[in-house]
């Protein structure tokens, strides 16, 4: 699904870092001459998932089963046996290997009493996906202590369909429910833009982040990947990107 992702997404090479309103660092990562696709592409997760499902439909070796839930897993020396619950009932499924990609709260990891180790950071961040027509270049901009949001950090980059992802550091002591309200979000964006341009909020969320991982990613016939195995800061889509790297490594 690399081609539809690259063609629909926003390609970029330049990243700029500012301290207040002064640029202090800049990179320009050009793809190698023999690379077929750009080095970095920004694309909303729902489009990426659409591309994945479309590609899976072209591969007869993959059986994608919707509305199904793994309710138990049993291991032996040479296989894993899953109990699957679906609208038609419950059935068993055997596999030589089970790739566990069920997210940060991984029910399967918990079934086996396994844990992740690391640190949860006491900080909160506001994500706002904003639809607007802007003449900003398709670059990643990152500010420390900007005049429009003093004492915190802000991240800006472009996605498909004129959607701009803005990430505001808020600190730990804020009220997450209050900060998600439009009357709190809109003034922050207006202060950042510094003009009266029109924009529309597409999506708003508050998150905290952690840096944690399992001590071992392989447990018998189970192979843990993605957020089930390790959790990182979401900056730069590190969670999704590292999950893809995990599965590519297995392949």
Model-derived features: positions:
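Short, conserved active-site loop motifs that form the nucleotide-linked donor/cofactor pocket
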Residues: 62-63, 68, 222
């Amino acid at each position: 699904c690399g081609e539809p992702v690259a063609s629909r997404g926003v390609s970029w090479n330049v990243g700029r870092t500012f301290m207040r309103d002064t640029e202090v660092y800049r990179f320009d990562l050009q793809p190698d001459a023999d690379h077929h696709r750009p080095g970095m592409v920004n694309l909303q997760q729902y489009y990426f998932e659409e591309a994945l499902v479309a590609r899976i439909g072209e591969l007869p070796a993959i059986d994608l089963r919707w509305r199904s839930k793994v309710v138990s897993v049993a291991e032996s020396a040479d296989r894993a046996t899953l109990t699957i619950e679906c609208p038609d009932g419950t059935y068993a499924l055997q596999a030589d290997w089970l790739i566990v990609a069920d997210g940060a709260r991984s029910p399967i990891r918990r079934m086996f009493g396994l844990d992740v180790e690391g640190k949860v950071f006491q900080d909160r961040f506001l994500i706002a996906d904003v639809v607007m027509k802007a003449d900003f270049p398709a670059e990643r901009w990152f500010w420390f202590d900007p005049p429009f949001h003093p004492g915190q950090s802000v991240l800006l980059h472009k996605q498909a369909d004129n959607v701009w992802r803005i990430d505001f550091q808020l600190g730990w002591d804020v009220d997450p429910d209050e900060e998600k309200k439009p009357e709190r979000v809109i003034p922050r964006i207006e202060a950042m833009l510094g003009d009266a341009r029109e924009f529309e909020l597409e999506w708003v969320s508050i998150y905290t982040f952690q840096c944690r991982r399992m001590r071992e990613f392989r447990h018998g016939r189970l192979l843990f990947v993605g957020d089930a195995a390790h959790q990182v800061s979401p900056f730069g889509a590190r969670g999704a990107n590292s999950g893809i790297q995990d599965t590519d490594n297995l392949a």
